UniProtKB/Swiss-Prot annotation:
The lineage of its organism: Bacteria, Bacillati, Bacillota, Bacilli, Bacillales. Keywords: ATP-binding, Cell membrane, Membrane, Nucleotide-binding, Transport. This protein is probably a component of a manganese permease, a binding protein-dependent, ATP-driven transport system. Probably responsible for energy coupling to the transport system. The keyword Membrane applies. InterPro entries: AAA+_ATPase (IPR003593), ABC_transporter-like_ATP-bd (IPR003439), ABC_transporter-like_CS (IPR017871), Metal_Ion_Import_ABC (IPR050153), P-loop_NTPase (IPR027417). The keyword ATP-binding applies. It is found in: Cell membrane. This is Manganese transport system ATP-binding protein MntB. SUPFAM superfamilies: P-loop containing nucleoside triphosphate hydrolases. CDD domains: ABC_Metallic_Cations. Residues 1-233 form the ABC transporter domain. ATP binds at residues 33-40. It comes from Listeria innocua serovar 6a (strain ATCC BAA-680 / CLIP 11262). Belongs to the ABC transporter superfamily.
């Protein structure tokens, strides 16, 4: 996946400034940086969910939007209307819709895919619950299940571990590593320094501009972190 000169601005204020990099296929890549660095904006800009001032994102010489059906997106929980009357099962079933198109409705095959995805995140017992009745960790598992039901090749996740229980985080991380091992490409906005080395193959260190990008052991260094965070207090945790 190639990102070339990506620039994004809100109300004439630059949020992402001329970012160019290449994300490796079949890797777990984390986007790391201080608050306000543009991490979520970069993720959304790559998918075309926010307007770009300039730049392009391509895969196999085609715009990333061309591959929309092969891309699964897990948003931040705050972006989801939890009052919407939809059950856990139906939420996961939505993951099968991209492959169906506009006319077809989910059948037996799609329902089995949704059930299998719920099994993987250990949420079958909650299938008839309304999504608004779930805890943060349970809801995040459901979002992951929806992505699994899509059978995507590329997964974008925006702060999937924020405010969830440790058991849910461990289960989700195990699933992401399994997807990676099966050749899927996964990009995660992340904030916990202590887990970067354990979770990711590569990282994108960002502060509106690209500070560094590459394998964790080469990129997640004290010098580069200090450059990204400036005077903000940061406890260096590479290798932890």
């Amino acid at each position: 996946m190639n990102i070339q000169g990506l620039t994004i601005a809100y109300k004439q204020k630059v949020a992402i400034d001329d970012v160019t990099l290449q994300i490796a296929t079949g890797k777990l890549t984390g986007i790391v940086g201080p608050n306000g660095a543009g991490k979520s904006t970069l993720l959304k800009g790559m998918m075309g969910l926010v307007p770009r001032e300039k730049g392009q994102v391509t895969l196999d010489n085609k715009p990333l939007t061309y591959w929309r059906k092969k891309i699964a997106y897990v948003p931040q929980r705050s972006e989801v209307d939890l009052t919407f009357p939809i059950t856990v099962f139906d939420m996961v079933l939505l993951g099968t819709y991209p492959a169906l198109g506009l006319i077809k409705r989910p059948g037996k095959k799609e329902k089995q895919l949704a059930f299998d995805a719920l099994e993987q995140v250990e949420m079958t017992a909650f299938s008839k619950r309304q999504i608004g009745e779930l805890s943060g960790g349970q809801l995040q598992r459901v979002f992951i299940a929806r992505a699994l039901a899509q059978h995507a090749e590329i997964f974008f996740l925006d702060e999937p571990f924020a405010g969830i229980d440790m058991a849910s985080e461990a289960l989700i991380m195990k699933l992401l590593k399994k997807l990676r091992d099966n050749g899927k490409t996964i990009v995660v906005v992340h904030h916990d320094f202590h887990k970067v080395a354990a979770y990711f193959d590569d990282i994108i260190l960002l502060n509106k501009k690209l500070v560094a990008h590459g394998p964790v052991e080469q990129t997640f260094t004290e010098e580069k972190i200090q450059f990204a965070y400036g005077d903000a207090p940061v406890a260096f945790a590479a290798g932890v």
